[in-house]
Design a protein with these regions (language model features):
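Acidic, Mg2+-coordinating active-site environments of NTP-dependent enzymes
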Residues: 29-38, 144-280
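Loop/helix-junction capping segments adjacent to catalytic residues or to phosphate/diphosphate-binding pockets
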Residues: 10-13, 102-103, 128, 156, ...
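N-terminal leader/targeting and accessory segments in enzymes
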Residues: 1-53, 232, 252
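Glycine-rich phosphate/pyrophosphate-binding beta-alpha loops
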Residues: 269, 287-291
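Residues at the C-termini of beta-strands that transition into short coil/loop
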Residues: 45, 96, 200-204
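Phosphate-binding loop of NTP-binding sites
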Residues: 48-184, 188-196, 241, 247-248
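Conserved functional loop/turn residues at catalytic and ligand-binding sites
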Residues: 23, 139, 265
C-alpha cells in the first residue's frame, strides 16, 4: 500500500501512478491533483493521519506487548539492546534505525504480526506534545525514559522543558494504568516510584540492583550473576541495566540474557568499535547532542 504523504520537499501524490505501476496494491491519496481513474486509489482528507490511525487500529488488533521508550540520548542503543534480549526468547519486532517520528512510529507498528509477542517502539521529539501524540498512536503497555539531557533546546528551551516533554510518556502510562520502567539512579524518574512500575538501581531500593564491574567494555552484576557486553563507555551502563531488567521481568533465563548481550555489537557510528592495524578505534560520530 502506498501512502501519498506530503513532505518538506516532495508531495507523494505526484508519485501515485509510478507506485501503482511498480506493484502497489492500493494508493491512499489526499489531493485533488491525482486524476487517475483507478479502483486502487482510496481518497482521504489526510494521508498521514490515515496512516497513523491505521497503525493504531492495527496495534489494537494484536496481542503483542508493546514497550515504548524515549529520552534525550541512548534511545536507539537501548531499543536495540532490549530487542536483542527479548528476541532471545520471544518473537520480537522493534523500530528500524531511528524511525521514531510521526511517520516512523506508525510504520514500526505496522510491522507487528499476529504471532509477534513483543514490540519495542522508539519515540522521538523536538517539541512539546510530540511524545504525547506518538504515545497515543503507540498505546504502549510499558514505558521507559533513557535520560533527560540538554538536547533539542530549540524546542524545549531548557532542562525543565526537556523533563516536561519526555515525561509525557510516563503521564500517559500512569493515566492508562500501564507500567513504568524506572531507573531509580535518576532522581527525576524516582519521583514516579509511587506509580505502577518495575525499577532498577545501583542502591537497595529497586526491584533489580546492579553493580558496574567494568566501564571499558561494560560488565554488570545482578545478585551473583555477571553480564558482559561488547559495548564501551560507562554511559551505556543504564542502557544495559534496562535491557537486563526487562528480560528478567519477562522471565528470560539469565544465561540467555548473557548470550544475547555478548552477541550484540553497536553499528552505524554509535560507539562502534573498529579494528585497524591492530588498534581499536571507537567511532562515536552519529550523535551531536551535548548531553
Amino acid at each position: 500500500m502506498f501512502f501519498a504523504i506530503k513532505g518538506d520537499n516532495f508531495d507523494g501524490n505526484e508519485f501515485v501512478e509510478e507506485a501503482l505501476n511498480k506493484g502497489a496494491k492500493y494508493a491512499i491519496v489526499d489531493s485533488d491533483s491525482v486524476n487517475i481513474d483507478n479502483s486502487k486509489i482510496l481518497r482521504v482528507k489526510d494521508s498521514l493521519g490515515t496512516l497513523q490511525k491505521l497503525a493504531t487500529f492495527h496495534r489494537t488488533k494484536t496481542n503483542s506487548i508493546v514497550i515504548a521508550l524515549t529520552g534525550s540520548n541512548g534511545k536507539t542503543t537501548t531499543k536495540e539492546l532490549i530487542d536483542c534480549v527479548l528476541s532471545s526468547n520471544f518473537k520480537t519486532i522493534s523500530t528500524k534505525g531511528n524511525y521514531n517520528n510521526h511517520i516512523g512510529v506508525p510504520l514500526s507498528l505496522l510491522q507487528i504480526e499476529d504471532d509477534t509477542e513483543y514490540s519495542v517502539i522508539e519515540l522521538g521529539a523536538n517539541n512539546f506534545g510530540e511524545i504525547d501524540f506518538l504515545t497515543k498512536i503507540t498505546l504502549p503497555d510499558y514505558g521507559y525514559i533513557t535520560n533527560f539531557g540538554k538536547a533539542h533546546l530549540e524546542g524545549f528551551i531548557d532542562i525543565e522543558g526537556v523533563i516536561k516533554a519526555k515525561t509525557e510518556l510516563y503521564n500517559w502510562i500512569i493515566e492508562n494504568n500501564k507500567t513504568l520502567i524506572l531507573n531509580f539512579d535518576d532522581k527525576q524518574q524516582k519521583k514516579f516510584r509511587n506509580h505502577k512500575n518495575i525499577s532498577f538501581t545501583s542502591e537497595d531500593d529497586g526491584d533489580y540492583k546492579f553493580e558496574l564491574i567494568s566501564g571499558k567494555k561494560i560488565s554488570v552484576k545482578n545478585r551473583d550473576i555477571k553480564y558482559h557486553s561488547n559495548i564501551y563507555g560507562d554511559y551505556n551502563y543504564s542502557n544495559i541495566c534496562a535491557a537486563i531488567t526487562i528480560g528478567l521481568h519477562f522471565g528470560i533465563d539469565s544465561i540467555k540474557i548473557q548470550d544475547a548481550l555478548n552477541s550484540y555489537e553497536l553499528q552505524n557510528n554509535r560507539s562502534q568499535v573498529l579494528n585497524m592495524n591492530g588498534k581499536e578505534i571507537i567511532l562515536d560520530a552519529y550523535n551531536a547532542n551535548p548531553t
